Amino acid sequence: MGEDPTAQGIDINIAGNSRGSPSSYFSPYKNPNLKDGPKGEYLTDRLTDEAIIILEKFKDDPFFMYFPFYSIHTPLQGRKDLKKKYLNNKLVHADYAAMIECLDENIGRLMAALDELGLRDNTILLFSSDNGGIRKLSKQDPWRAGKGSYYEGGIRVPITVRWPGVVEPGSTCTEPVTGLDFYPTFLDAIGSSPSPGKILDGRSILPLLTGKGSFPKDRTLYWHFPVYLQNYAGEEDQSRDAKFRTRPGTVLRKGKWKLHEYFEDGALLLYDLENDPGETHNLAQEKPKKLQALKEDMYAWRKRTDSPVPSKRNPKYIPQKISTR
């Protein structure tokens, strides 16, 4: 939503700003868009309190609530009463586990509030994450790597949808979708459409939710990141190398096939996710026709979207060995 969510059409902004992580999960929060509570108040609890107040205020009106809990994000600071439960468990990170339980608890509070306000049957509830977990704290197996990576451990996350009377409870769908699909889906659900001239990269997944209508099989999804993401100073996370979480490149997925291209050395990594979900065996040499077809698709998309691709090497760059797996 950027530095100021209200510039994107949001009417009320509570605690949202350009930072992806809080200064502290305990008050005082040092957040310009959230008044401090009593000393020691826990951020996840406080944000849920604020969300419930908003629900109560607008329960008789149509509303859209975008509620990105800061949790579970660094700094890892679990609520003290929950952290105590995990201190003697050597198999888990006590703060991390406490933060997960607190998040789960507060999602339950939010759902209970919808029920109590009579909003359950007329509200679409969608829960997901913007990335995979931090591998050194929580392995994503069988997916490779973790947050910040193009590998499945970094970009594959579950989505849970509750929509009484529309989405069948307990049903599942294996069709890959992306966060870019949420906005057009919500528009479709309320019978609306984008503003004239508005170009959307995603598409409505309403047919997948309702089981009605058609949805393109094996559509192509793209990820493009032409810069470096964080020097990890050798921390092992199963990414392409231990130096950076992500290096400049583009990734494409079409059906069971996934293609990585890295700009520094032109490396092409081709994986069959159906038979190799952990992305361990590069098929670029074994499947030249498939590689070429996906590469042409990728290049055409970059041209169509005018995606930037770095063309000049940093004069201070010192080549180092990079994995080709």
Where does each model-flagged region fall?
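Formylglycine-dependent
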Residues: M1-M65, F69-K80, Y232-R240
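Histidine-centered active-site microenvironments of extracellular/periplasmic hydrolases
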Residues: E3-G9, L76-G78, N88, A112-V166, ...
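Substrate-binding rim/cap in mid-to-C-terminal beta-strand-loop elements of soluble/periplasmic
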Residues: A15, G20-K35, G108-E116, P142-I199, ...
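Active-site rim elements
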Residues: K35-E41, H93-A97, V166-P176, I190-P196, ...
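C-terminal, low-complexity/hydrophilic appendages and adjacent surface loops
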Residues: K147-E152, W223-A284
